[in-house]
């Protein structure tokens, strides 16, 4: 009794499993002439498989007992260059090109039990060729490969379904696999359009414009450095100033601006490619069309425009740039900060001097149109840094010098004045042995008929002889001249000697004018130039001067007063202050001093002063309240108006009224102090006091001339000149020649215990070269250049 339920259950299971197979009709062998008959492996009988309709849910698992089909893949032949397999449609069916041979690869299980397979579009499993085991290109239990082609589908037959039959059945039947992943269609689905074509063309044009904008701004804005924009703001035109002012705040966000433009450019270029794929189609045509549009309209044209018009284009697109910076701020700000950390922030670097010089030379023709004077000056000032004294000095062979034995007669003074020099070196025996300097102004009050010796005059004034090395930079020499102590220096070089200490040999002379010539790149004919060009040594072409003997002939010198007024003026001045007495200034020198410094103001010069508020001419202003003055003035005739005090009380000063007696007192005290010093230092100290404005006063009144007036104006320098001239006249026969033993040089003093080669550091020091050292160091004597001139003068006399 216990076995009855189990037997009943087994019977029910067998009936259930075999009932579908027995219910399907068996196809006869009448259709054995079809495309391919079914080959039964276990028997020689050829049977046509019948069709078993599949159910809706997993037919392969319900109706195929052993075979399981998991999916399929379609492949084109390796030799085929055409794209045959087009992918999947929305139904997940594989899309292929119709009537093209493809390889169908099936994946699953128990494929060794497949008896036949085919594809059907109408559900009959007879509309395409059947494939048996012998027709398989490759077969494994999990993989089967067949080669076939699919005809073009119609609207009613839109896809091909897989039909599979198993072996080892008396009545083999096809089972249709309803899985959409195993279905094949030759109907090419329409391309999904993002938008209508007319709207796509409009968007394409807009994206191309933005691509060009990003590309152009990337080149135009990033090449405009903040330094260059500041130059436009400072020195550009009004339009350039406005444009640069708008761009500068945006341009300072260097890395953030760069990231914004690059990201925007990449995004719009990708959008152009997608729209081209929709409008033109896929394949090589899209590649050519997208590349051509991006390169031509997005790169070449905008960058060519922004290279030349970067400033105006960048200024007019600032609103768009600001919007893009705002929209992309969350993305670009972190990237820009990372770039700032690793690459540092963008620095505003100016051009180095050497690069600036080369840039000016390269842009000479294109910008300035040739070497104009302004261009030469700028270039000369920049090149001054690399030049030394040797580049600008006048060689010693071309220097106008005087021998120390020369006698200054009337004819010789005339010749010296005819040369046009104001500072003349004096040499002793050898032209390389310069011992003193003579200023032509020192001869102003001397009588040429007294035949003074040039060395005696130079010893009285004792002008310092400055010496520098030949390799001294011109910029340092210019700084020395700018201090105002001297504007001329001798140039020496170090000469090595065997078994002896090195010596310093004269090789030229440098003046402030020579440095200015190097700056302005133009030759200036000064008192040291015997040649017109220091480089090419071109001789000066002098114009014939007028008769200079009238300068030294005082008998016919013009004066603002007559002889009677001159005599009275001499008498008044000699008694008004001790500085005008014969103890300081000789009467003959005083006469020349008064003649030289008398001035007359005509009434016609004040015809314009009738109007109120007119500025007075310079000759009419004698003293200004609060301004330093170093002159003494005596009214000889006429009247001057003096304004005194806060109330501006006005007084008139008539004839023989004097102003500036403080200058006379200070000068007398300075002379008395100098008498207590050595002869070589007395004149130097007086010159130093006058140069430093130590002799003078600050008036607390204003003095102007409103009417016709004659007055005598004598400065502290005139008083010193008159005093020195008087000393020369008094000691003409007794004076002992004092050579310059205070020749100041920029060469360091060499210690006796030092090595033979002197060592110099960067500091500028002064040293005193004694006469004995000079005579010992300098070479042999040279002939006097003025011997022939003296003989010629003696013959004329």
Curated annotation (Swiss-Prot):
Subcellular location: Basolateral cell membrane
Glycosylation positions in this chain: 31, 42, 676, 692, 724, 731, 761
Cytoplasmic-side segments: 222-255, 302-322
Entry GO MF terms: transmembrane transporter activity
Broad class of where this protein is predominantly found: membrane
Any single GO BP term: innate immune response
One GO CC term on file: plasma membrane
Record keywords: CBS domain, Cell membrane, Glycoprotein, Ion transport, Membrane, Repeat, Signal, Transmembrane, Transmembrane helix, Transport
Parts of the chain on the Extracellular side: 24-200, 277-280, 344-797
Expression tissues: Highly expressed in the intestine and in neurons, but it is also expressed in a variety of tissues including the pharynx, hypodermis, rectum and in muscles.
Recorded phenotype for the gene knockout or disruption: No visible phenotype. Double knockout with cnnm-1 results in increased levels of intestinal Mg(2+) and reduced levels in other tissues. This Mg(2+) deficiency in tissues leads to a reduced lifespan, 100% sterility, and smaller animals that exhibit a developmental delay with defective gonad development and which therefore do not produce oocytes or form vulva. In addition, the gonad development defect in the cnnm-1 and cnnm-3 double knockout is rescued when the AMPK alpha subunit aak-2 is also knocked out. Double knockout with cnnm-2 results in 22% sterility.
Pfam families linked: CNNM (PF01595)
Every CNNM transmembrane domain range: 193-373
Leader sequence residues: 1-23
Listed transmembrane segments: 201-221, 256-276, 281-301, 323-343
Domain spans labelled CBS: 393-454, 461-527
Topology relative to the membrane: Multi-pass membrane protein
Keyword Repeat listed: yes
Gene3D superfamilies: CBS-domain (3.10.580.10)
Stated family: Belongs to the ACDP family.
Role summary: Probable metal transporter. Probably acts redundantly with the other metal transport proteins cnnm-1, cnnm-2, cnnm-4 and cnnm-5 to regulate Mg(2+) homeostasis. Promotes postembryonic gonad development by regulating Mg(2+) levels, probably via AMPK signaling.
PANTHER family to which the protein is assigned, alphabetical: METAL TRANSPORTER CNNM, UNEXTENDED PROTEIN
Protein name per UniProt: Metal transporter cnnm-3
């Amino acid at each position: 009794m216990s076995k009855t339920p189990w037997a009943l259950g087994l019977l029910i299971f067998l009936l259930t499993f075999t009932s579908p197979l027995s219910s399907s009709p068996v196809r006869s062998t009448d259709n054995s002439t079809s495309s391919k008959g079914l080959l039964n492996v276990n028997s020689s009988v050829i049977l046509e498989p019948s069709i078993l309709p599949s159910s809706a849910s997993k037919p392969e698992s319900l109706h195929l007992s052993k075979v399981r089909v998991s999916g399929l893949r379609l492949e084109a032949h390796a030799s085929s260059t055409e794209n045959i397999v087009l992918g999947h449609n929305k139904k997940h069916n594989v899309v292929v090109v119709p009537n093209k041979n493809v390889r169908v690869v099936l994946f699953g299980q128990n494929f060794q039990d497949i008896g036949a397979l085919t594809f059907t579009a109408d559900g009959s499993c007879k509309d395409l060729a059947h494939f048996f085991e012998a027709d398989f290109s490759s077969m494994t239990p999990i993989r089967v490969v067949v080669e076939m082609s699919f005809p073009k589908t119609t609207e009613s037959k839109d896809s091909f379904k897989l039909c599979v039959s198993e072996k080892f059945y008396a009545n083999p039947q096809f089972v249709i696999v309803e899985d959409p992943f195993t279905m094949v269609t030759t109907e090419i689905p329409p391309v999904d359009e993002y938008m209508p074509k007319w709207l796509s063309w409009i968007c394409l044009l807009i994206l191309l414009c933005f691509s060009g904008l990003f590309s152009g701004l990337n080149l135009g804005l990033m090449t405009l450095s903040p330094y260059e924009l500041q130059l436009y703001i400072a020195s550009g035109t009004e339009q350039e100033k406005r444009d640069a002012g708008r761009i500068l705040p945006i341009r300072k966000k260097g890395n953030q601006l760069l990231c914004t433009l690059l990201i925007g450019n990449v995004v719009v270029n990708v959008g152009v490619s997608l729209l081209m794929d929709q409008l033109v189609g896929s394949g090589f045509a899209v590649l050519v069309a997208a590349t051509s549009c991006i390169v031509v309209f997005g790169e070449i044209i905008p960058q060519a425009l922004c290279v030349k018009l970067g400033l105006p284009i960048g200024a007019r697109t600032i609103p768009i740039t600001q919007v893009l910076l705002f929209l992309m701020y969350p993305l670009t700000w972190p990237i820009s900060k990372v770039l700032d950390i690793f690459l540092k922030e963008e620095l505003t670097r100016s051009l180095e001097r050497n690069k600036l010089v080369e840039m000016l030379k390269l842009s000479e023709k294109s910008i300035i149109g040739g070497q104009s004077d302004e261009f030469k000056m700028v270039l000369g000032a920049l090149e001054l840094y690399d030049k030394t004294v040797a580049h600008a000095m006048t060689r010693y062979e071309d220097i106008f010098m005087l021998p120390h034995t020369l006698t200054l007669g009337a004819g010789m003074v005339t010749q010296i004045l005819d040369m046009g020099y104001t500072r003349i070196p004096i040499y002793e025996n050898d032209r390389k042995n310069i011992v003193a300097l003579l200023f032509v102004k020192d001869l102003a009050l001397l009588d040429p008929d007294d035949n003074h010796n040039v060395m005696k005059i130079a010893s009285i004034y004792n002008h310092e002889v400055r010496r520098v090395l030949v390799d001294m930079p011109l910029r340092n020499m210019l700084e020395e001249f700018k201090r105002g102590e001297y504007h001329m220096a001798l140039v020496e070089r170090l000469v090595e000697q065997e078994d002896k200490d090195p010596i310093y040999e004269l090789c030229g002379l440098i003046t402030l004018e020579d440095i200015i010539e190097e700056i302005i790149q133009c030759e200036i004919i000064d008192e040291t130039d015997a040649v017109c060009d220091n480089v090419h040594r071109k001789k000066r072409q002098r114009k014939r001067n007028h008769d200079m003997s009238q300068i030294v002939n005082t008998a016919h010198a013009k004066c603002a007063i007559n002889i009677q007024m001159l005599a009275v003026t001499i008498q008044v001045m000699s008694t008004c202050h001790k500085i005008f007495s014969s103890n300081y200034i000789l009467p003959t020198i005083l006469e020349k001093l008064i003649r030289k410094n008398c001035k007359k103001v005509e009434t016609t010069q004040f015809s314009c002063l009738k109007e109120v508020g007119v500025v007075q001419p310079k000759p009419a202003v004698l003293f200004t309240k609060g301004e330093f003055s170093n002159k003494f003035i005596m009214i000889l005739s006429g009247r001057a108006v003096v304004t005194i005090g806060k109330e501006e009380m006005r007084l008139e000063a008539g004839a023989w009224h004097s102003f500036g007696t403080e200058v006379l007192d200070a000068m007398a005290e300075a002379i008395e102090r100098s008498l207590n010093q050595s002869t070589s230092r007395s004149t130097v100290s007086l010159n130093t006091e006058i140069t430093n404005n130590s002799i003078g006063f600050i008036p607390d009144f204003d003095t102007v001339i409103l009417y016709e007036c004659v007055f005598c104006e004598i400065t502290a320098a005139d008083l010193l000149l008159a005093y020195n001239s008087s000393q020369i006249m008094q000691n003409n026969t007794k004076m002992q020649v004092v050579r310059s033993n205070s020749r100041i040089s920029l060469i360091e003093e060499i210690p006796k215990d030092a090595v033979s080669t002197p060592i110099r550091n960067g500091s500028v020091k002064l040293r005193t070269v004694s006469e004995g050292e000079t005579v010992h160091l300098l070479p042999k004597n040279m002939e006097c250049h003025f011997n022939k001139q003296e003989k010629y003068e003696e013959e004329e006399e």
